[in-house]
Amino acid sequence: MPGLSTTLASISLPSCLMNASGAWSGTREEPRELAASATGAVVIKTATTQARVDAVQGCGLENPGQPYYLAVLSALKAAGKPIVGSVAGFTTAEYVELAHAYAQAWVQIVELNLSDPIVPCNRGGTCDLAAVEAVVKAVRAAVPVPLAVKLPGLPDGAVGHAVERLRRHQIEVCVCHTPQLATFAPALDGALDLMAVGGISNGKDAHGALSRGAKAVQIGSALMQEGPGVFARIQQELIAERAIHETSA
């Protein structure tokens, strides 16, 4: 939609809104429904090397395994929407394997999910920045496509250290929790594109995140409640919100 387009890692997106990796992307049909909606990109549900059934409640990593999603990708090509393949490994080698497979399968951006509480980088909700760096370094060396790193919530004092590690290995996109935008944006200082996730349910939320430095936002809970039509609604609200702020400026 005019005025709402953006770029992530130099890739043009028709809209700054997209789904979060766990929302409306778990079956073969749901990514197709997203591709036909007003979303700016289709984020495939976080994949692991093998199927995970009855994973730890709330961890978000229950999935049928990456081969299932690789089979979905071919059907999405015709839609023309950029594809983000989200991956989670339990070793650095698994992250490399998963990212490489998506890089070979027409995925424009690979998202490294380092935020889930059962992955080694964030075991029990405590982020190990040395482990984060080991993963991003290995994947960057093996994968030529743009990389987005989804980080867990961090203490404010740790944000600068995390950003330094991402910059060191030429990561293109940082995905952070929306409440931490005010901390991440100045630390990144434009070196990486910033994407917000969490708590975006209307145009006002989206405008707030974008005005605090995000180039795009991911929508999860609102999408699950309303379905893919949520993107058109939030887009219209975002346009109205921008008009209000432009008038009052």
Q: Where do the protein language model's features map onto the residues?
A:
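N-terminal capping/small domains of soluble enzymes
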Residues: M1-I83, A88-F90, I234
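Short donor-sugar binding/catalytic loops of nucleotide-sugar-dependent glycosyltransferases
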Residues: I200
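Glycine-centered helix-coil hinge/cap
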Residues: G65, D189, G227-V230
